[in-house]
Each structure stands twice: as C-alpha cells, then as structure tokens.
Amino acid sequence: MPKKAVILYSGGLDSTTCMAIAKAEGFEPYAMSFAYGQRHKAELELAKGNAKPMGAVEHMVVEFDLRKMGGSALTAEIDVPKEGVGNDIPVTYVPARNTIFLSFALGWAETLGAFDIFIGVNALDYSGYPDCRPEYIAAFETMANLATKAGVEGAGRFTIHTPLIHLTKAEIIRKGLSLGVDYGRTHSCYDPTADELACGRCDSCRLRLKGFAEAGMTDPVKYVKGEK
C-alpha cells in the first residue's frame, strides 16, 4: 500500500515537479496550497486545476491573510524588483512563509497518519531566501519530531523531502519533463499582467527563463512581448 505524503503545492514550476517526483516515488500525494493574501491568484488557480489530474488524492487550500502583516512585495504594496537576482535577501521574501506552510503541512500529515512531507525548495538557482536552505529544512524536521504527538510517542519519524534542493533550474526542468510535467500549466511570475502574462523580469521569471535556456528548451508559458 502506498505511503501517504503531504505535498506543498503552489502551482509553480518547482512544486509541480516536486508533486510529480513524489508520485513517481510511489507516494500517495495529498496536495496542500495556500491563499495567503498573495497579490495574484494565477498560480493558485493552476494548482486547483492541476492537483487531481496530477494524482492528488485530496487537495486542501488553506486560507489566511498575511497582508495584515505586510513586509513583502508579494503581500503588500511594494514594487517587485526587476533588476535581476542580487546577493541580498530580496523584498519578495515573505516573512517566515515556509515555516508557516510547513507547520500546516505537518498538522495535516499528523492527522492523516503520514510521516512524509514534500517541499520544492531549491538552494542553487534561487533568490536567497533563508527558509530554502538545507540547514533550515533539517532544523524544521527536528522540530517536527519533537513537537508532535506522533513524533514523541514514536509512531513514526517525520521526514521533510526536498528533492530539488541541490538541482539547478535546468536539471529540475529536465527531471519534470522526464516525468511528464506540462510546464505550460505552471506559473512562476511574481508580477504578472492583468491577463496573467509573465513579466519576464522579476527574479522568478529570470530564474525560470535561465533554466529553460540552459536546458535547451523554450518556456511554454506566455510572457509580456519582448521579455521572453
């Protein structure tokens, strides 16, 4: 019988690849997405449409509003940087977001009797977010096994799976394509137009386009004219 796993699933390139990997590894995927007050819903709407076709047994959308706290260009009226990927943590970082997301995933996993959680973080082609690093994931995994009834009573050991963490974006894309991922049904842009065209200039678009270029392929999503 397949083991249950909770997959953090935004509808973006990385999380979609992560879902496909979990399925290929024999897990029974339970997808979890978040409506957290993000400035656009294009990614979330794709997640809603894709989760079940990708094999999710259930798809839970958790709603809360991080706009009340602000502090990020993804949740507040702060301009999304378009100058390229820098060395500092950018304003698109959402304070403690992965800790919040993983905490919800941990709660659902414990309820399901699952001990495996997948998250599509990457520490190579990424924007420098602190909650995407291997040491952060290791720390959260330790906490998960100390902070839950299932972990303390020894029913099992929680594992946070990060299959993309040491891959380049090109390697992620190649892996996904080998598993049948349709990247035309994913969204990565931080600042899309009203008709959901990707801007081509934010960190996320730049990393995505770089990945497709290095993989020798054309990104199937639509971009603002002249930005692809």
Swiss-Prot record:
Coiled coil: none annotated. Belongs to the QueC family. Catalyzes the ATP-dependent conversion of 7-carboxy-7-deazaguanine (CDG) to 7-cyano-7-deazaguanine (preQ(0)). Zn(2+) binds at C189, C199, C202, C205. InterPro entries: QueC, Rossmann-like_a/b/a_fold. The keyword Nucleotide-binding applies. It comes from the Bacteria. This is 7-cyano-7-deazaguanine synthase. Its cofactor is Zn(2+). It catalyses: 7-carboxy-7-deazaguanine + NH4(+) + ATP = 7-cyano-7-deazaguanine + ADP + phosphate + H2O + H(+). GO terms for molecular function: ATP binding; ligase activity, forming carbon-nitrogen bonds; zinc ion binding. Keywords: ATP-binding, Ligase, Metal-binding, Nucleotide-binding, Queuosine biosynthesis, Zinc. Binds 1 zinc ion per subunit. It comes from Geotalea uraniireducens (strain Rf4) (Geobacter uraniireducens). The keyword ATP-binding applies.
